[in-house]
Amino acid sequence: MCIRDRRNAILEPKNLATRKCSEMTLNALTKQNHNLIGGSADLAGSNNTKTKHQKIIKPGDFSGDYIHYGVREHGMSGIMNGIALYGNLIPYGGTFLIFSDYCKPSIRLSALMQKRVIYVMTHDSIGLGEDGPTHQPIEQLSGLRSIPNLNVFRPADRVETIECWEHALKSSKTPSILSLTRQGLNPIRKSFTNINKCSLGAYEVLRTNNKINLTIFASGSEVNLAIETSHKLAKDKIYCKVISMPSMEPVSYTHLRAHETDSYLVCRLLLE
């Protein structure tokens, strides 16, 4: 499924929010995998976590595969841990990234217990949102990345979103965070490969010249900004290499070193 969807995403490039990309991926996944139990903390329409194939679990009818948890992120996260502990089921639940603080105790337990729980966190920046600074995450990503045995993914387009979901589902002993945008993003992947590049942690998406003056590392929505900035700098003969870094987990360290070989005189910038 994932390889076919990646190929289709490259052949049909569109400006999409990664929350929408996640919904498209989930539509394909829930059609095939009936062990996925979805849900949201009263934000299903904003998180794009419910698919057309899913049936809501209701009082007196537990045959469904989607839970409306209500406005209670902490309760949702604890219930997802319980579902994962039961076995043979993969729970995922959605909220805004700013509300990950309410989920934090259960996220830590997911990591400690080595359970495959997937947290879909949307509206992941100050880029777009009608609710103002109370709903704009700033320090949350750093806090989540500091938790051992937790995948934190911030994809930059539809292809990366598919790859992050693929990696999260294969991480049988590690919970995952998918940090997703509300605003639309231009596609960054132009050519198809069977390799899941997001599993590498970091990889090159643009090089404006063989002689590089600046390497820009970016994730999520800022990859688009890094690419746009690189093209503008090239007009002033300042040449850049852009590295998409959807994950900062240890698996990426080796690949990060590979991007340090151009020259020790090359400046490096982390944009997020």
What would you call each of these model-derived segments?
Residues 4-179, 184:
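Thiamine diphosphate
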Residues 49-55, 108-109, 190-192, 251-257:
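Short glycine/threonine-rich loop-to-helix capping motif typified by GTGT followed
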Residues 85, 231, 235, 267:
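Short, well-ordered alpha-helices that flank and scaffold nucleotide-derived cofactor binding pockets
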Residues 149-256:
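Glycine-rich ThDP/TPP pyrophosphate-binding loop and its adjacent helix/strand module
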